[in-house]
């Protein structure tokens, strides 16, 4: 049985988005391994405290990630 662990910075994704992640990740596993995997696929979402995550050696806060998302969406 697969266990898929997703780590996110807290506050970046809302509950609806996280639920969609779980559904989509499960569907991806089923697409790869077949329908019998649906009932045995575990998806765990762990939220990492803002500022306890780093990119390129620099800590990231929730606000930093939201600013990156806004820039990407504006492009």
Model-derived regions: residue spans:
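A domain-level signal for the structural core that forms small-molecule/cofactor-binding pockets
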Residues: 2-75
């Amino acid at each position: 049985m697969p266990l898929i662990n997703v780590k996110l910075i807290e506050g970046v994704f809302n509950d609806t988005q996280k639920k969609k992640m779980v559904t989509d990740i499960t569907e991806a596993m089923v697409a790869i391994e077949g329908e019998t995997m649906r009932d045995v696929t575990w998806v765990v979402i762990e939220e990492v405290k803002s500022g306890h995550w780093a990119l390129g050696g620099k800590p990231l806060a929730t606000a930093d990630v939201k600013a990156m998302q806004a820039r990407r969406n504006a492009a």
